[in-house]
Amino acid sequence: MDELPFGEAALEQALAEVCEMDAALLTDIEDMLQLINNQDSDFPGLFDAPYAGGETGDTGPSSPGASSPESFSSPASLGSSLEAFLGGPKVTPAPLSPPPSAPTAVKMYPSVPPFSPGPGIKEEPVPLTILQPPAPQPSPGTLLPPSFPPPPVQLSPAPVLGYSSLPSGFSGTLPGNTQQTPSSLPLGSTPGISPTPLHTQVQSSAAQQPPPASAAPRMSTVASQIQQVPVVLQPHFIKADSLLLTAVKTDTGATMKTAGINTLAPGTAVQAGPLQTLVSGGTILATVPLVVDTDKLPIHRLAAGGKALGSAQSRGEKRTAHNAIEKRYRSSINDKIVELKDLVVGTEAKLNKSAVLRKAIDYIRFLQHSNQKLKQENLTLRSAHKSKSLKDLVSACGSGGGTDVSMEGMKPEVVETLTPPPSDAGSPSQSSPLSLGSRGSSSGGSDSEPDSPAFEDNQVKAQRLPSHSRGMLDRSRLALCVLVFLCLTCNPLASLFGWGILTPSDASGVHRSSGRSMLEAESRDGSNWTQWLLPPLVWLANGLLVLACLALLFVYGEPVTRPHSGPAVHFWRHRKQADLDLARGDFAQAAQQLWLALQALGRPLPTSNLDLACSLLWNLVRHLLQRLWVGRWLAGQAGGLQRDYRLRKDARASARDAAVVYHKLHQLHAMGKYTGGHLVASNLALSALNLAECAGDAISMATLAEIYVAAALRVKTSLPRALHFLTRFFLSSARQACLAQSGAVPLAMQWLCHPVGHRFFVDGDWAVHGAPQESLYSVAGNPVDPLAQVTRLFCEHLLERALNCIAQPSPGAADGDREFSDALGYLQLLNSCSDAVGAPACSFSVSSSMATTTGTDPVAKWWASLTAVVIHWLRRDEEAAERLYPLVEHIPQVLQETERPLPRAALYSFKAARALLDHRKVESSPASLAICEKASGYLRDSLASTSTASSIDKAMQLLLCDLLLVARTSLWRRQQSAASAQGAHGTSNGPQASALELRGFQHDLSSLRRLAQSFRPAMRRVFLHEATARLMAGASPARTHQLLDRSLRRRAGSSGKGGAAAELEPRPTWREHTEALLLASCYLPPAFLSAPGQRVSMLAEAARTVEKLGDHRLLLDCQQMLLRLGGGTTVTSS
């Protein structure tokens, strides 16, 4: 065995020598102790997070910090480092004698329990290697630390940091892993330790090569000698009362090598720093520079050596740690999104995060909808099976054959689930059966978003329907009809039979001779018999041929869909999806679903012009045959001529379902939600009508009537005016269909049975628009029902007729009260129509009927109530007006939010007239006049903003303006009556109107004059109210008499010679004539009356007219004035 490089004699000599460097260091320490600054700012990295407190623990053999024997270098490299490190007595093996210069023994401390790291602390195995080159001849590249003699002080027992007793070596653990605080190290109790340089290297076992085999004996010997040596490792741990001295500077520590050090692995960062010495209480503690592998340390430990460089580096470390945490969060979220993408759209798809989340949301909603629908179907099937007995099930299976299949026995491809609906900007429309990829009407999606792989293999496949349920196409039906027509017109059977019979006679005639023959007479007799029998046989054959063709067309050519069959499942699937699309407002997608539903029933819509022409001609022929009851009876035998009640019931139900779908498509086309021309719409209307008639009692009469009305609408819209008489026929059929079953017409169609509504529908000039026009007098109804739009137009027509009855009554009205009664009749009809024009809550379903589900139009009802109140005020029927006050006071929200001032003008005019026309108030209040002024302001704004107003707007403005003027006149007349009650004469000697009243009256009169420029019926009211204004102001009575005489004498002279000049100005009505009589008889001076008794005669005539008008209160006033003037004269009706 070779001699060890560190012998007993060498160690004694090294420890006995006095080191000059120790003396120099002690001298420097004494000089610099006076300059020690104990502030925390000198050591900024002392109390950072890596040096937080914790328990000190030793690294056991099984701990990650324990070094394996492979982590040591060769014994030749251990001797020099151990010789330089040991500054006191050491324990040697048995063969060696203890040195005499080591009087102090090292006290061994018991092992501390293993350290348990806290949360967030990662334990890193850090092997420690002490390198020492051979003493005699160092190898190249080996760094030899100087040897220092021991100081005169003795070694005190001190705890060892990171030291553990092992049978074959020792290990050091980094302070960051053991959570040792600087305050827990007894630095002041370690005297006698000289400042000796100690070179250590920490690297992973994977990057270090094992030592040679020849170095194993030395390795074991050295390990046995140094296992009890206390090693103090304190890299960069300092205290505030310590002094930091740099003894040895290693600028190239990141690249130096020793004899026993292998090259560091790539990617290993080297942390190299100067040898640091801590001096506290006469104790010198050497720090160890470490070589750290960055892959084995947490992020907050990578730059721990540079903590003392300043606070900027600390902030950078915190920023690095925060970025690392954010990176972990992002990585976790991205992993979950990738996992969600794999579940929803498959692993091969390439989607962004938003598309993945959108797909997931759509898929979840689809699953919820599918579960709900399956639960409903399950409950339906359970209830159906519970209601059937065993005998019914057996009979159904025996009669239905293979067509009536239960849901449990269906094929998987029929009952398979739908694919989830595509996203807004997602999958292409061909991926889902809910969209029509073949028609090209649905919007295509992006190719980067494929469908879910869970449904790629389960998509609905196009099944070949059974031959008996598919039926015949329309072009085949038309071809068969043409064939029958040709057989009836050309009669080929007669020609065929005639040729076959005449051929033998012609043949015998060619070879006969000139002589007589007895057989010739016999042949002549046989030909006469066949000629007599041939025509009936031919017509019988033709009749049989026609019957066979009709049976083939109506009985065996009609597609019949049995319940719970594959086509029925497909039909109801698309039907329910169409309901959802209608409720969502996606009318294009709803039309596509209805198109697919008809295709599932075996009734595909025509796709070419030829198919469209054939389908339209066939529907015309079929409707003509059904008018003769032949086609309707044959259609009732659809499915077969055998008496199968269940099959016929299923045929009627199939016809009903197809008719409802055709009708809904027709409604969508009429409202502009479905593309196509007039021929397409006519074909849809005829198809719905023919199938609804064939459905019989399977369809409700309200739905059948609605289909008739839709056909009448199509005639009104698409056909020329010469064929508009057909609308009367269809409306009559709808009325008969309603009365035949229940004896009552549905609420939505009652106005069609009224003479005014029937005349408006047939002769009115109106049109159905795809986008309903905004109106101030009604709200839009069902957006997919054209009948609701026509009802809305009729409501506005009724309101206009009621206003015109007051503004410009008919010239031939002999009765003065007729204008008010006609207006009230129109308003009553308007109230009934407004209950059926609004959009109902469940009107978007395919099976919903406008006749059964109706709503209310609050706007039309409010305008009707307001107009009725004004009419009752004009008739002086205040009790009837008071019953409508609550309806007028609550204006609808739609009218409150509108920007047009006309509804506000109407509301405040009602409030002002209600306050001023009350006969119980004699004096005007400022509040009532303020409301009146506000109403006048809104009315002027309405006249200024509607320069091109419609006729109904002008009629309403005339009514409101006249109402305000009448209210002001009534207030002035009550004041005059109260003042003149004290006088003896009938003429008014009371005070004139105030300036405020006159100014308001003149403003309203100016508005009336402005309205009369564009609306001619307002001119006659201008004359009357202008005369009233002159009377209120006390102006010259001459001009006032002329204005009143214009209203009095136009009515008498209008029946004379008439012409164009006489019709330029409208004639005054009975109400205007009565008002002029009262003003002239009460307020004109006696000088302007032609005779002494003319005043009494005028009052008597006014009383008779008022009695005709039904104004009982004004009649009582006239009688009282007559009693004062004539002394008991009474008025009798004449």
Curated annotation (Swiss-Prot):
Residue ranges, annotated region (Leucine-zipper)? 367-388
Biological process, per Gene Ontology: cellular response to fatty acid; cellular response to insulin stimulus; cellular response to starvation; cholesterol biosynthetic process; cholesterol metabolic process; circadian rhythm; fat cell differentiation; insulin receptor signaling pathway
The annotated regions of Polar residues compositional bias extend over 165-202
Keywords recorded for this protein, A-Z? Activator, Cholesterol metabolism, Cytoplasmic vesicle, DNA-binding, Endoplasmic reticulum, Golgi apparatus, Lipid metabolism, Membrane, Nucleus, Phosphoprotein, Steroid metabolism, Sterol metabolism, Transcription, Transcription regulation, Transmembrane, Transmembrane helix, Ubl conjugation
Query: What residue ranges lie in the Cytoplasmic compartment?
Result: 1-481, 558-1134
The reply to whether Glycoprotein figures as a keyword in the UniProt entry is: no
User: Coiled-coil ranges per the record?
Assistant: none
**Distribution of this protein across tissues and organs:** Expressed predominantly in brown adipose tissue.
Which branch of life, at top level? Eukaryota
Give the sites modified to Phosphoserine.
Answer: S97, S116, S331, S332, S389, S395, S448, S1047
Question: SUPFAM superfamilies from the entry?
Answer: HLH, helix-loop-helix DNA-binding domain
Among InterPro entries, the record links this protein to: bHLH_dom, HLH_DNA-bd_sf
Q: How is it modified after translation?
A: Phosphorylated by AMPK, leading to suppress protein processing and nuclear translocation, and repress target gene expression. Phosphorylation at Ser-395 by SIK1 represses activity possibly by inhibiting DNA-binding.
Region of interest: Transcriptional activation (acidic): 1-60
Q: Can the keyword Aminoacyl-tRNA synthetase be found in this entry's annotation? A: no
- TM spans (from-to): 482-502, 537-557
User: bHLH domain: from which residue to which, for each copy?
Assistant: 317-367
GO terms (molecular function) for this protein are:
chromatin binding; DNA binding; DNA-binding transcription activator activity, RNA polymerase II-specific; DNA-binding transcription factor activity; DNA-binding transcription factor activity, RNA polymerase II-specific; nuclear receptor activity; protein dimerization activity; protein kinase binding
The UniProt site entry described as Cleavage is assigned to D451, S452, L480, C481, L519, E520
Q: Where is the composition biased (Low complexity)?
A: 61-83, 424-453
For region Disordered, the annotated ranges are: 46-102, 116-221, 415-468
Free-text domain note? The 9aaTAD motif is a transactivation domain present in a large number of yeast and animal transcription factors.
- UniProt protein name: Sterol regulatory element-binding protein 1
Organism of origin is Rattus norvegicus (Rat)
